[in-house]
Amino acid sequence: MLARFPLYLRLVRMDKPIGSLLLLWPTLNALWIASDGHPRWPLLAIFALGTLLMRSAGCAMNDYADRDFDRHVKRTADRPLTSGKIRAWEAVAIAVVLAFISFLLIQPLNTLTKELSVVALFVAGSYPFMKRFFAIPQAYLGIAFGFGIPMAFAAVQDTVPMLAWVMLIANIFWSVAYDTEYAMVDRDDDIKIGIRTSALTFGRFDVAAVMLCYAATLGIYVWIGVTLGFGLAYWAGWAAAVGCALYHYTLIKDRERMPCFAAFRHNNWLGGVLFAGIAAHYLLAGTAGN
């Protein structure tokens, strides 16, 4: 069992934290905004650990769902399940255990948060199968990756205001942007095996679609900043996020594999600077208030 532990860590992508961070940033945005910049530490711990566990569970389920496809893709052929180093039932068991631990984590929270967690679990569990049917599965991924937003508002305010759903929409656009960059890496392999991705759906307009999705995401955050009366610190973070998006254009415009993958990974910085702007606004507002 201990000898297989490194394989299990690879299965749930503990060696690749970028996915967890892409879930964490919008969740932190929601926690900070919902609590006016003063989220409780226990709540932060619950959502941070829950994000890590659910992303890990999602990776295990994704590898289970894609086990017959991944062996035909250069980037994924050596994954533990695809290469036969672990069995299918082990991946499912790990996903179930991690999801159960995540559910236990939220037991101290209110009923609305628990109810939303059931929806989140369904979306996360069904996402891996969307690539068979949905032309832009990355939009569904945006819901799965962003469902921490309404859950955060529910946990703090015991309600889910319109603002939370607007932030979720922004996250859907962002997910389509960065996961299309990711899909551009595997375009040739995905054509051969016949799965659906946004990179294939957008075709020769893929770069334009990515940039439009970034524009939509950051445009929504303009509305959020204006509506909430955010100050200069927020807008500095927003401007840095715009700079990140423009940098991504230079990476993806020629549609080469490694630069597209670099653009995907760089989204950690885009999410990070946007959150930093939100956190800095509340920090400075609190200091000014004192």
Curated annotation (Swiss-Prot):
Cofactor(s) of this protein: Mg(2+)
One example of a Gene Ontology biological process annotation: ubiquinone biosynthetic process
One cellular component term from this protein's GO annotations in UniProt: plasma membrane
Principal localisation: membrane
The UniProt record lists the keyword GTP-binding: no
Catalytic activity entry: all-trans-octaprenyl diphosphate + 4-hydroxybenzoate = 4-hydroxy-3-(all-trans-octaprenyl)benzoate + diphosphate
Alphabetical list of PROSITE patterns matching this protein: UBIA (PS00943)
InterPro entries according to UniProt: HB_polyprenyltransferase-like, Prenyltransferase, UbiA_prenyltransferase, UbiA_prenylTrfase_CS, UbiA_sf
EC class (word): transferase
Pathway(s) served: Cofactor biosynthesis; ubiquinone biosynthesis
Keywords: Cell inner membrane, Cell membrane, Magnesium, Membrane, Transferase, Transmembrane, Transmembrane helix, Ubiquinone biosynthesis
Any matching Pfam family: UbiA
Membrane topology value: Multi-pass membrane protein
GO molecular function: 4-hydroxybenzoate polyprenyltransferase activity
UniProt keyword Magnesium present: yes
EC number: 2.5.1.39
Subcellular location: Cell inner membrane
Cited HAMAP family: UbiA
The protein's name in its UniProt record: 4-hydroxybenzoate octaprenyltransferase
Organism: Burkholderia ambifaria (strain MC40-6)
